[in-house]
Amino acid sequence: MMAGIVACILLVFVTVITAQPQAVFLEYIQGRMGVLEERIAQWHDQSSRFSGELRDFKNQVLKMLENIEKERDSLRNEMENTNVRVNRLEREVDYIETQNPAPPCVEIDEKLSDHHGAKKKKKEKYQKITDCSDTISQVTAMKILKRFGSSAGLWTKDLAGNSDRIYVFDGAGNDTVYMYPRMKEFTLSSPTRKAAKIRLPFPWIGTGHIVYDGNLYYIRQDNEFQVIKFSLANKTIIDSAVLPIEQQVPVYGLSKFNYIDIVADEEGLWVIYATKENEKNICLAKLDPSSLSIEQMWDTPCPIENAESAFVVCGSLYVVYNTKLPSRSRIQCVFDVSGTISSENVPIVYFPKRYGSHSSMKYNPREKQIYAWDDGYQIIYKLNMKHRDELY
């Protein structure tokens, strides 16, 4: 009996001893579970708060985007209205300029005429090679191709051929010409990567150069100004000549880097220049493209002052004028070598407002367009022609 009681006491004691760690473990587990539940509840609270803040931020962004869209529409409307007003002002200015044109340059200096005498009178009559009888009545369109290079420069096609190649002279002095196979390559964002570089044997000066019938005619300045005829096919000099012109001065008052400007029209090659002897007005000469000899020379009534460029169309010299603070360029003086155009009957032609001033303007006889360089922008002007009989 006593043994049974002892056994029961031992069993109870062992049970108590083994049950105590289990209770501690359960209590520990319950504590950890409570902490986890608390953290989960806290995470839910934070998640709800963050969701609310994100929703508020999204609403703010949407509201800001809506306001930006409204402001953009408002700015677009303002720009359209401004453009309409500018166009209206341009038309009004054109009308005022048409009703009150600046006086054309028609008077010839009597002293200049007497000084040259019979020598010049012998060459007053010019025998035309073609039957071209067009004159410029209006600049009908302007196309801005791109902006490339320096503020001064020249770009042109071959003015006596059907080639689509583009030739670019960057700056007012260098020894490299860029050649592009087509207009597409020139208008690319990085055009120099598509260009073939032509290194000339002598550096060129000014922007009075030209590509004509596969040859490059450019101006070299040594002791005297020299015209170089360079074959683009063989990359060699074919001929060179010093023009019989003494004491040259800049031919354009607003483009001081140009002393000689070689241009082309339906009649062939011409040279526009100025001398100290006749330092007020521009001179013109007919150039033989084969021998580089001067065929005829004229003193024109067109002033050098405020001239920025010039070109020849059907044997008539058109001089483009501007102001020192660039405004709208205009053809204000016309000199016809055959004497069939009277300056009084030629209207003043205005060019569209652009960026600065023209450093070069090359007339393309085949396309009836002008390739111009305006403060680093390459521009094409389309011309509207009239028969000379329509002026009278």
From Swiss-Prot:
The keyword Heme does not apply. Residues 52-100 form a coiled coil. It is found in: Secreted. GO terms for cellular component: extracellular space. Residues 131-387 form the Olfactomedin-like domain. The keyword Hydrolase does not apply. GO terms for biological process: signal transduction. It comes from the Eukaryota. Disulfide bonds join 132-314. Residues 1-19 form the signal peptide. Belongs to the OLFML3 family. This is Olfactomedin-like protein 3. It comes from Xenopus laevis.
